[in-house]
């Protein structure tokens, strides 16, 4: 049997694994771990995240906010990396579907946000 799980940021992979093994042992079930990744979390209070939120707010005029995801994103192994974009409130969520698309207006707004974020993060926005 294959068991896939994501670990909360408040516990290490080793801690969860030892608890699972202890819970399964009385039932004669062995747990073999093939792959494990430590949880990835970047605080909303980090300077990096604050700059990204500032750019979003400056470009859109809307209040930015952070969302914690349980999924494994492309930034999981990037220290202090965060996923940023690309959907806006009210957009149809069609990411990763067979007919994936983005509205032209959203694509252009994302490009403007990303360009400004790069400038801000590089200190070139003055």
Protein language model annotation of sequence segments:
Residues 14-26:
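Short amphipathic alpha-helices in soluble, non-transmembrane regions
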Residues 5-7:
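Hydrophobic beta-strand positions in extracellular immunoglobulin-like domains
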């Amino acid at each position: 049997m294959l068991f896939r799980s994501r670990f909360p940021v408040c516990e290490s992979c080793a801690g969860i694994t030892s608890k699972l093994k202890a819970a399964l042992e009385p039932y004669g079930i062995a747990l073999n771990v093939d792959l494990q990744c430590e949880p990835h979390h970047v605080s909303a209070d980090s300077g990096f995240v604050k700059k990204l939120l500032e750019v979003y707010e400056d470009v859109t005029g809307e209040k930015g906010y952070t969302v914690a995801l349980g999924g494994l994103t492309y930034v999981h192994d990037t220290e202090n990396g965060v996923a940023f974009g690309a959907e806006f409130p009210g957009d149809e969520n069609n990411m990763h579907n067979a007919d994936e698309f983005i509205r032209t207006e959203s694509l252009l707004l994302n490009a403007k946000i990303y360009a400004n974020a790069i400038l801000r993060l590089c200190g070139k926005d003055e």
